Amino acid sequence: MQPARRVVTSTVRLRARGGVSGVFTCRGCLTRPRLPLPASAPQQRRGLSGSAPRNAAPPGLYPAGIAELSSRKLISVSGPDAAKYLQGVITANLTPGYAGPNPTSEHLRSDAGFYAAFLTAQGRILHDVFIYRDVRDTTHPAGHSWLVEVDAAEADRLQKHIKRYKLRAKFDVRLLNEGEGRVWHAWDDANPSSLTTTQPSFPSSSPTIITTPDHRAPNLGHRLLTFSTPTPSLPLPTLPETAYRLRRYRHGIAEGQAELLYNTALPHESNLDATGAVDFRKGCYVGQELTIRTEHRGVVRKRVLPCVLYPDGQAEGGGVVVVPGEVGFRSDVGAEGVTAEMVPAEASIGRVGKKGRSAGKWLSGVGNLGLALCRLEIMTDVVLPGETGGTGFVEGDEFVVGLGGGSGEEGGEGKKVRIKAFVPDWLRTALASKEGH
């Protein structure tokens, strides 16, 4: 009886028409006979780089496209006190350069939209949001009308939260119906700047589309809001929302309260400090105290990182176990049809062959790609401020997460898959810049 072995297929990158990259899996690789390995052959480990690739375009990750985000909804906040109220409850700065109590339209930031978050008084994330100037509104003066984009499953809760704490502030809050406004995300890796010149002009005095760059990660794309047109008129292929999720996951960007856990996640651990959601020069907003203290005096030991799942090497005897060397995508983990969707949310991550504290917590994923909250000193080579290397990370260590019915620790009950975290270049750069301050 031949020993069990793993078959690794090769991929060939092709340049398709129009500059769109594709991936071809050689049929010969699927049918070519494999030489059996001796039963006693040790498992070989390859590709343990801890950094995401700079220019690779993994299979299944589209280099250009536009996707409607049904997972997001819009809330209208309009009235004389709308800007003042928002300034006091979000992490971003609505009035950069002005610290007075009564901002006017001249003091407001000029960009069409920006990323921010609502926090609890203890500094934990309630909602991650994009906030836009509502330039459709002609019934209020400039700067009195705003649109808040939020996780669709949390939109009603945020609306109630705003109403509860508005007190005597003069503004109205309303959740937009699906037909009133839609959220899209567009990207074009070959020409990222092309989207800045595509905003259409419209016959009425109010535009029916709002566009703004998504600055959470370099060249992540653009956010678009449409109000009367079914689809933005852009020369890009229309893709399902899953394509956008995979793009986020590859860049290490969490979104919504399934990934930024409501009243649990912390801004720094969720990378909000590195994605432009927090203005640390701003004062007097809900949750500021802990957020500022963490920035200047705390050590952030956990961060949300992109992760790749691959088969548990202990499931078969002998063979070659290929440890992912890049954040590449496939529709399953490569073991009995297992996918990232089968990993329970918040499942614990453990180190293979060792017991001890959890190395992280799984958040969400598609196929073999997803996000996890990872302990940096255990799962990555990142050296924390004030510490030296060798505090926990060991080159060659592997990690495992359970599919349910047991913990992620090696030896736990239930099926397991292995997991590897990567630190995106943009996050490494952001962390390095903090060390210089």
Swiss-Prot record:
Entry annotated with the keyword Secreted: no
Highest rank taxon of the organism: Eukaryota
GO biological process assignments: iron-sulfur cluster assembly
Source organism: Chaetomium globosum (strain ATCC 6205 / CBS 148.51 / DSM 1962 / NBRC 6347 / NRRL 1970)
The protein's name: Iron-sulfur cluster assembly factor IBA57 homolog, mitochondrial
SUPFAM superfamilies recorded: Folate-binding domain
Molecular function (Gene Ontology), one example: transferase activity
GO cellular component: mitochondrial matrix
Family: Belongs to the GcvT family. CAF17/IBA57 subfamily.
Keywords: Mitochondrion, Transit peptide
